[in-house]
Amino acid sequence: VIVPPEGYLKQVRELTDAHDTLLILDEVQTGLGRTGTMFACEHEGVVPDIMCLAKALGGGVMPLGATVATRKVWEKAYGGLSKAVLHTSTFGGGARACAAGLVTISKLVEENLPERARDLGEYFLNGLRTLQKSYKTIKEVRGKGLLIGLEFDKPVEGLLDKLTAGAINEFAKEYYASLVAGELLGKHQVITAYTLNNPNVMRLEPPLTVTKDQIDYVLNALEDIFSQRKGLLRMALSVVTKKP
């Protein structure tokens, strides 16, 4: 979960325009209200030529993906009979999935869920940054709206770290976030996971309907885990021996 610096997307848009290149954005995870606007690119007022959507588009009840394009791109691909069959799909147009997508978009707009994600995301981030001040193992808190990453750093310090020449912390880089996630699930019934491209980062992506009380519950659960200051071995044992 890396938030690009302000102005990054605008510069990308300028570069693609300068070189007459299409700008294609993948908003499968960031789109549909997750970051506090309907689409993440709206934070910088950028309009892509093509946008990829999925996951939340189905409202959690139907698998649905979509490739959305500007009229100019659409006309280029499908604007005449000679072009209409150049781009096809062997599986698409599911009526029930599309109906779920339409209802999902309607609910996002009617219930102001992007704005809700913006406000509750700020509340969540502030709570996590307060935790960070108390626990050095939290290296960084970052995110936008309700797309949040919690990166960990050196859960072991002092003599043990020196005796192992830092090896135990190298081990922790691969497993600490998953151990924290395991504690959250086993002890507090909170489902989360580490990120695939950095196993030392835990993703926090609650539903856009999450409440402040539920966010507080997660913050208190993390406080409980960090305050116990368990070693890696104890944490691993508590995760694998936890009875369902």
Regions found by a protein language model. Name each.
Residues 1-244:
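Conserved N-terminal phosphate-binding loop of PLP-dependent enzymes in the Aspartate aminotransferase
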